[in-house]
């Protein structure tokens, strides 16, 4: 028996396929999902979601949202998502560098908050890119 996993953003579906296991970056910590998991609704933070399908792990950078688990279906609704193998690592590193620079130089509260969010997003993208497609 498998899980049906969907990762959906406001403008596209990033993943829609069966899987054996899912690890979610819930706001309360990493959350592992296997078949026949109890029904669950959880908040998703900025981080890396991992999906094991066909015996191989795939990484997806996700940015804030919710996940619902019910009847062997995992539905993840997030603001942004990018599969690890599709991440432009150089662009993510540039975003991280820029965010770090703003944090080191700006005293504007709004700029610093945005820079912290950009930093989290960049780190998730880089981590997903490095995980790529592992067995």
Curated annotation (Swiss-Prot):
Top-rank taxon: Bacteria
Gene3D superfamilies hit by this protein: F0F1 ATP synthase delta/epsilon subunit, N-terminal (2.60.15.10)
Topology term for the membrane: Peripheral membrane protein
InterPro entries cross-referenced by the UniProt entry: ATP_synth_F1_dsu/esu, ATP_synth_F1_dsu/esu_N, ATPsynth_dsu/esu_N
Transmembrane segments: none
GO cellular component, as recorded: plasma membrane-derived thylakoid membrane; proton-transporting ATP synthase complex
Pfam families: ATP-synt_DE_N (PF02823)
Keyword line: ATP synthesis, CF(1), Hydrogen ion transport, Ion transport, Membrane, Thylakoid, Transport
Subcellular localization, as worded in the UniProt entry: Cellular thylakoid membrane
PANTHER family: ATP SYNTHASE DELTA/EPSILON CHAIN, ATP SYNTHASE EPSILON CHAIN, CHLOROPLASTIC
UniProt similarity note: Belongs to the ATPase epsilon chain family.
Quaternary structure and partners: F-type ATPases have 2 components, CF(1) - the catalytic core - and CF(0) - the membrane proton channel. CF(1) has five subunits: alpha(3), beta(3), gamma(1), delta(1), epsilon(1). CF(0) has three main subunits: a, b and c.
Protein name: ATP synthase epsilon chain
């Amino acid at each position: 028996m498998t899980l049906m996993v969907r990762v959906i953003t406001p403008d596209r579906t990033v993943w829609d396929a069966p899987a054996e296991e899912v690890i979610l970056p819930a706001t309360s910590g990493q959350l592992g999902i296997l078949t026949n998991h109890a029904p669950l609704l959880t908040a998703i933070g900025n981080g890396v979601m991992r999906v094991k399908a066909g015996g191989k792990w795939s990484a997806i950078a996700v940015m804030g949202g919710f996940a619902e688990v019910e009847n062997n279906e995992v539905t993840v609704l997030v603001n942004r998502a990018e599969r690890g193998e599709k991440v432009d690592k150089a662009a993510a590193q540039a975003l991280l560098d820029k965010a770090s620079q703003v944090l080191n130089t700006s005293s504007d509260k709004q700029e610093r908050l945005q820079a912290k969010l950009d930093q989290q997003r960049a780190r998730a993208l880089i981590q997903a890119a490095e995980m790529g497609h592992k067995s």
